[in-house]
């Protein structure tokens, strides 16, 4: 890296990424896929002093290997971890769940929503998280959605999160009788470069994360959106994945 890049990275490293994102009670549900973003989000929740229940989903995704990384991280941290199994038939029309569809390669940032979008996925995931949060007395849900360096999914936008929070307030006992459950999105406005820098600051074990939509024999393809964005983040920072 040249000197100007080094100076920019120093400035980003000095940025207080890990300031607390929530000041309510100490219980939270964290949606954890096993990828870079959700694992960084998990470590942010730890930095916020939360007592965490991690929640993952097995929905027949072709990148199910991510779940093994989620298990490794939660075991390392000693955090309770639930993996909820959902029928793949609920998620038709996506290349992540239908092997007859091809995962786009080398096509980062096209205008149309890619076929890796999974219909209703975050709606369902957040609904399960709300149920778990209300049942465990948690005041917040962490989700690693991002609307900067991302594939363009509509259920990752801040507008969606805001509307879902309104639904929680209107549709839950907790929301109608007192402070509602918050959805916290600490990565929402960060570039992939900034997410890597945040993870590095939070001491995320990057080697225990996996980001690929179309892995083969346990290895990342290196060409899908998830791989390209991950590579971009680490290349721009000079931070090691190991």
Curated annotation (Swiss-Prot):
Quote the cofactor binding remark: Binds 1 zinc ion per subunit.
Q: Where does ATP bind?
A: 32-42
Give the superkingdom in one word.
Answer: Bacteria
Q: Does the keyword Membrane apply?
A: no
Which cofactor does the UniProt annotation name?
Zn(2+)
Q: Which reaction(s) does the protein catalyse, per the Swiss-Prot or TrEMBL entry?
A: 7-carboxy-7-deazaguanine + NH4(+) + ATP = 7-cyano-7-deazaguanine + ADP + phosphate + H2O + H(+)
One GO biological-process annotation of the entry reads: queuosine biosynthetic process
Provide the E.C. number(s) assigned to this enzyme: 6.3.4.20
Name the InterPro entries for this protein. QueC (IPR018317), Rossmann-like_a/b/a_fold (IPR014729)
Enumerate the residues binding Zn(2+): 212, 221, 224, 227
Its UniProt pathway annotation is: Purine metabolism; 7-cyano-7-deazaguanine biosynthesis
Which stretches does the entry tag as region Disordered? 1-22
Q: Does the keyword Nucleotide-binding apply?
A: yes
- What keywords appear on the UniProt entry? ATP-binding, Ligase, Metal-binding, Nucleotide-binding, Queuosine biosynthesis, Zinc
Q: GO: which molecular function terms?
A: ATP binding; ligase activity, forming carbon-nitrogen bonds; zinc ion binding
Record family assignment: Belongs to the QueC family.
Q: Which purpose does this protein serve, as stated in its record?
A: Catalyzes the ATP-dependent conversion of 7-carboxy-7-deazaguanine (CDG) to 7-cyano-7-deazaguanine (preQ(0)).
Spell out the NCBIfam families in the cross-references: 7-cyano-7-deazaguanine synthase QueC (TIGR00364)
Name used for this protein in its record: 7-cyano-7-deazaguanine synthase
What does UniProt list as this organism's lineage?
Answer: Bacteria, Pseudomonadati, Spirochaetota, Spirochaetia, Leptospirales
């Amino acid at each position: 890296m040249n000197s100007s890049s080094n100076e920019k990275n120093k400035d980003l490293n000095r940025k207080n990424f890990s300031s607390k994102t929530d000041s309510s009670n100490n219980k939270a549900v964290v949606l954890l896929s096993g990828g870079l973003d959700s694992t960084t989000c998990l470590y942010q929740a730890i930095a916020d002093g939360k007592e965490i229940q991690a929640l993952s989903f097995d929905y027949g995704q072709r990148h199910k290997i991510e779940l093994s990384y989620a298990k490794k991280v939660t075991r390392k941290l000693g955090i309770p971890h639930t993996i909820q199994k959902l029928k793949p038939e609920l998620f038709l029309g996506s290349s992540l769940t239908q092997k007859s569809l091809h995962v786009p390669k080398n096509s980062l940032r096209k205008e149309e929503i890619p076929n890796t979008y999974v219909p209703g996925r975050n709606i369902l995931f957040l609904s399960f998280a709300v149920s778990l949060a209300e049942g465990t007395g948690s005041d917040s849900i962490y989700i690693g959605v991002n609307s900067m360096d991302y594939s363009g999914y509509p259920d990752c936008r801040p507008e969606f999160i805001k509307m879902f929070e309104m639904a929680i307030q209107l549709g839950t006992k907790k929301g109608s009788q007192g402070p509602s459950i918050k959805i916290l999105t600490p990565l929402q406005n960060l570039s992939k470069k900034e997410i890597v820098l945040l993870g590095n600051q939070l001491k995320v074990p990057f080697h225990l994360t996996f980001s690929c939509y179309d892995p083969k024999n346990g290895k990342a393809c290196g060409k899908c959106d998830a791989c390209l964005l991950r590579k971009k983040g680490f290349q721009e920072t000079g931070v090691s994945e190991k």
